[in-house]
């Protein structure tokens, strides 16, 4: 499925939030470590902050950073928040071993979900304040 088809599918199905999850690669196998989050529009920065915050609570996970104004194809959609999560580097043997562990992957995704829940709560609070 092309990126455009994926975007159309999101819009057609009235997606509220899109989180694109990947493994990072590149750099030196010993120097490139950690998880990172990316957003294109500042209005979605808090979603990436919430997700990254929970991922940083995991033992042995380094912070590779949070990048704003990041231009990836899916983030071009402005109808709903869309962010990218790079879990760990598959080009690092130590991180590849972590990613091979199903329990570790599950814990990572549970932390992504916790960040999403926090973001939704923040949106509801902001929405309630806007109505006052």
Please identify what each model-predicted range represents.
Residues 1-4, 27-32, 49, 72-76, ...:
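Extracytoplasmic/secreted cell-surface and envelope-processing proteins
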Residues 1-46:
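Catalytic-core regions of hydrolytic enzymes
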Residues 3-7, 34-35, 45-52, 96, ...:
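Extracytoplasmic/secreted envelope proteins and their assembly/folding machinery
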Residues 11-15, 52-60, 104, 113, ...:
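Sec-exported extracytoplasmic/periplasmic mature domains
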Residues 20-25, 40-42, 69-70, 86-93:
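Active-site-proximal beta-strand/loop segments in catalytic clefts of secreted hydrolases
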Residues 41-68:
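Active-site-adjacent substrate-binding region
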Residues 59-76, 127-132:
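Short catalytic/ligand-gating loop segments at beta-alpha or beta-beta junctions
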Residues 93-132:
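His/Asp/Glu-rich mid-to-C-terminal helical/loop segments that flank catalytic regions of hydrolases
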């Amino acid at each position: 499925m092309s990126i455009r088809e994926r975007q159309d599918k999101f819009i057609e199905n009235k997606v509220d939030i899109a989180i694109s999850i990947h493994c990072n690669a590149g750099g030196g196998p010993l120097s490139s470590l950690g998880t990172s989050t990316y957003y294109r529009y500042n209005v979605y920065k808090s979603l990436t902050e919430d997700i990254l915050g929970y991922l940083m609570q995991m033992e042995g996970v380094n912070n590779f950073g949070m990048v704003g104004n990041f231009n990836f194809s899916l983030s071009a959609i402005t109808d709903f928040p869309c962010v990218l999560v790079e879990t760990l580097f598959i080009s690092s043997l130590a991180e590849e071993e972590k990613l091979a562990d199903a329990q570790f992957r599950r814990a990572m995704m549970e932390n992504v979900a916790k960040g999403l829940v926090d973001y939704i709560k923040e949106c509801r609070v902001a929405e309630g304040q806007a109505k006052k």
